[in-house]
Amino acid sequence: MLLLSVNPPLFIPFIVAGDPSPEVTVDLALALEEAGADLLELGVPYSDPLADGPTIQRAAARALAGNMTLPKAIHLVAEMRKKGVTIPIILFTYYNPVLQLGEESFFALARENGANGVLIPDLPFEESGPLRELGERFDLPLISLVAPTSKQRIERIASVAQGFLYCVSSLGVTGMRETLPESLGDFVSEVKRHSRVPVAVGFGISTPEQVAMLKEVCDGVVIGSALVQKVEQLGERLLAPEEKEAAIAEFAAYARSLAAPLHAPCSLR
């Protein structure tokens, strides 16, 4: 069961499995936990990532060029556990690779290798019932996305939410944004009003200032593109034996700077 403490709010980083290599992905996961991550989203690269912006698309292309697959990504979770990663790990994967592997086989393999949840961004809520049942059976919650929509739809999604609810901060694909919608606070408050599980916000979160603002209204902040871009910038240094340690330390320091506002004292609401 995925039980999350949300005081202070959760820092939920996202990285892509296999970018820049499987081995470095494990090292990055360790660095993120040491930097204060409460939960890790491990993105499974896919050739047609409809929900992802250019930064994560490029990372997926690099990982696919290195022959990363869904089964290999799942086995990376086991490697992370062997190396000492203890925080919950959520597999972020598109539906087609799950279908190819087999839905039940996917949940069984994920559970066997130490994953703690699943997020499938292109799975419509109306079609998610069978996978939610598999999630309950394997104690591997299917995390639901909820975007700005009608109160009735928010209530329906929240009523069956498992693990935590992932609020999409703005419509469109993932990617860093200079500003967040003014209506975001009201949207998150509406979701929290109906939710029995923690409510996290993602898509576009890329600065400590945005994190500081969001900690006042939600239970967790997901940061993806900013961290994936940092991996891209570090590039070959992460793969060079003589530079790898320093590059990972730089990545960890950047992650720590993004998470820092979550652990600062809250202002009065």
Curated annotation (Swiss-Prot):
Keywords: Amino-acid biosynthesis, Aromatic amino acid biosynthesis, Lyase, Tryptophan biosynthesis. The alpha subunit is responsible for the aldol cleavage of indoleglycerol phosphate to indole and glyceraldehyde 3-phosphate. One of its GO terms (molecular function) is tryptophan synthase activity. One of its GO terms (cellular component) is cytosol. Its EC number is 4.2.1.20. The active site is at 41 (proton acceptor), 52 (proton acceptor). This is Tryptophan synthase alpha chain. Pfam families: Trp_syntA. InterPro entries: Aldolase_TIM, RibuloseP-bd_barrel, Trp_synthase_alpha_AS, Trp_synthase_suA. The keyword Ribonucleoprotein does not apply. It catalyses: (1S,2R)-1-C-(indol-3-yl)glycerol 3-phosphate + L-serine = D-glyceraldehyde 3-phosphate + L-tryptophan + H2O. The keyword Flavoprotein does not apply. Pathway: Amino-acid biosynthesis; L-tryptophan biosynthesis; L-tryptophan from chorismate: step 5/5. Tetramer of two alpha and two beta chains. Gene3D superfamilies: Aldolase class I (3.20.20.70). Belongs to the TrpA family. SUPFAM superfamilies: Ribulose-phoshate binding barrel (SSF51366).
